[in-house]
A protein has these predicted regions:
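N-terminal entry/capping and adjacent linker segments that precede and initiate structured domains
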Residues: 1-396
């Protein structure tokens, strides 16, 4: 007979428990103080913590608390973000409402072994469901036909209530966390200048500041969220600048103050040889961008200290063969050994070793997403975001 659910782990100190809750046969074993036990639990991965909720009522209460969930996420992320990182994607073939997850740790550690994609049928038979971003382990979902938003935690299965928004077609948008007010926000830009801020929990939509007029074009519609700064960021070309003049700035939006600003780019030498627009991304929670030279050499720059021009440094140079595509090189993640996961201009995923310059094509099994091209051959119609496992609860 299997043991009772509150006695799966015996001989341990249960947070908030009394002597009667512990096994008397194991009373001679050393007992950990509650604060040390909590510190140990904070270091555990999400899957283990979900299992440990069955140990006893006090553990379930602790692990289910919002503060523990956020503390666990921050501690695990700061220790090694690769352990909890995945790429989450949706496909732009709207009649296939599936969301897929590609784990990054096995991809970096064993590129010659097959890494499997886990995909979910989101059950939308009418209308399209798209992903608008991911932050703190929460995925922002947007149902286009009903004009509704919700936040979803794939690890726990919990989700917020749908709430309706007034605008459905975005020119630009970005999803992030306002750590000052403890709010998750989706910022959308309608047309050329109307900014709408959708706040989860309050389930409200408000008109924000006018979109800055100096920026007449953005490189990419999706704003990049930098955790800790509370900002969304877009690459923007200034008014009147020619395509070959490199007059680009990073346009930022402060989620707490709800104001626009600018972040300086590094001082780049040369010019006139760029085929595609710069591509803005976030690596190691730092702003990064790639810029090309004749579409065959791509430099990857990282801003170590947000907002400080002198902190920009080139972290990698990727050399490619000549090709017919005018798409940028897109970095998704970087391992502790400085291996970059990139999407090539032809939409294939590749691993790049910065020290040797070698490229490796990882083996990926995306058969669970059978409606699409296999990811290992081409990522067509897929929009990717970086996702981290967490126990964080969506606001209600």
């Amino acid at each position: 007979m299997s043991p009772p659910r509150d006695r799966v782990v015996e001989g341990c100190n249960l947070v908030g428990s009394t002597a009667k809750d512990r096994n008397p046969l194991c009373s001679t074993l050393p007992v950990l103080p509650d604060d040390i036990l909590v510190e140990i639990l904070l270091m555990l991965p999400v899957r283990a913590l979900l299992q440990f909720k069955c140990v006893c009522k006090s553990w379930r209460t602790l692990i289910s608390s919002p503060q523990f969930a956020m503390d666990n996420f921050r501690q695990r992320s700061s220790a090694d973000r690769d352990l909890t990182s995945r790429l989450v994607y949706y496909n732009r073939l709207y009649y296939h409402c599936r969301v897929g997850f590609l784990p990054l740790q096995p991809l970096f550690n064993s590129p010659s072994a097959t890494t499997k994609v886990v995909s979910f049928d989101m059950g939308c038979r009418i209308g399209a469901l798209v992903v608008r971003g991911s932050c703190n382990g929460l995925v922002c979902l947007h149902h286009l036909q009903s004009c509704c938003l919700r936040l979803w935690n794939p690890c726990t299965g919990s989700a917020s209530q749908w709430f309706r928004i007034e605008f459905n077609c975005f020119t630009y948008y970005g999803f992030g966390y306002d750590h000052v007010h403890d709010k998750y926000k989706l910022v959308t830009v309608e047309g050329q200048d109307l900014t709408v801020i959708c706040t989860f929990g309050a389930n409200s939509s408000t008109i924000g500041p006018k979109f800055p007029s100096p920026a007449v074009g953005l490189s990419g519609s999706i704003g990049k969220f930098v955790s800790g700064t509370g900002t969304l960021n877009w690459m923007a070309k200034l008014t009147g600048s020619a395509a070959n003049e490199r007059k680009w700035v990073i346009l930022s939006f402060d989620l707490a103050n709800e104001t626009f600003g600018q972040v300086p780019l590094p001082r780049l030498s040369g010019g006139g040889d760029n085929t595609c627009d710069p591509e803005l991304q976030v690596l190691r929670n730092c702003l990064c961008f790639t810029i090309d030279h004749n579409n065959t050499v791509f430099d990857v720059w990282m801003m170590k200290d947000y907002g400080v021009t002198e902190s920009w440094m080139m972290i990698s140079r990727v050399k490619l063969w000549r090709h017919k595509y005018n798409n940028p090189l897109t970095p998704f993640s970087i391992s502790e050994h400085d291996v970059l996961l990139l999407m090539l201009p032809d939409r294939r995923l590749v691993l790049h070793k910065s020290d040797s310059g070698l490229l490796y094509f990882p083996l990926i099994d995306s058969s669970s997403d059978a409606h699409h091209f296999p990811i290992c051959s081409k990522t067509n119609f897929r929009i990717f975001f970086l996702y981290h496992d967490s126990l964080v609860l969506p606001p209600q």
